[in-house]
Amino acid sequence: MATHIAMPVNIVPELTLEQLRALPLVDEDFGTPEGAVLCLEAAYRRKSIEAVCACKNFMVEGTVALLNVDEDLAHDPEVRNKNALLTERAFRKAITEAWPDLKGVESFFTNRQAYHDGFVVVVEIRRSPDGKFTKHNHLVANTHSGWRVLNEVSDDELD
């Protein structure tokens, strides 16, 4: 179903911390892909599974996953509905069993690239309180209710 990305490894960002902090600020809202990522992270910090799920779109995420497996299945409404439900259930279980710890994490958005019509990948560099940096490639979709975060993709999927 969903692509599982290995735990992010520490990186050395191309920009200095001073340069990262000088990047334009992003509003925490669903008006931009980056804002949707910030909404998701804020919901993680509050440990609110309902707020987290409101930042995502499981129908779109599940359909993208089906397209990667079998295009015919992705066009079957019953299969898409069932897959969306299963994707959401699995996500809720995984998150509530192991909430991401984003306390004190700084987020910097360094790139946005087109992925497909209505989809972009937002590259986020996170700096943890211990000074380590990690890179995250968020697949984000423009939906009827604004931008929604789907899942992370690997660098290999972007090439």
Identify the residue ranges that each predicted region occupies.
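Solenoid-repeat scaffolds in large eukaryotic assemblies
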Residues: 51-53
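Hydrophobic beta-strand residues in large extracellular and virion-surface proteins
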Residues: 37-40, 107, 121-125, 139-140, ...
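Surface-exposed, charged secondary-structure patches
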Residues: 25-29, 33, 61-133
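Short beta-strand segments enriched in hydrophobic/aromatic residues
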Residues: 44, 56, 125-127
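Residue-level detector of alpha-helical recognition elements and their boundaries
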Residues: 55, 67-68, 155
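Short, low-complexity N-terminal intrinsically disordered segments enriched in polar/charged residues
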Residues: 1-49, 58-62
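Short beta-strand edge/turn micro-motifs at domain boundaries
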Residues: 1-23, 130-159
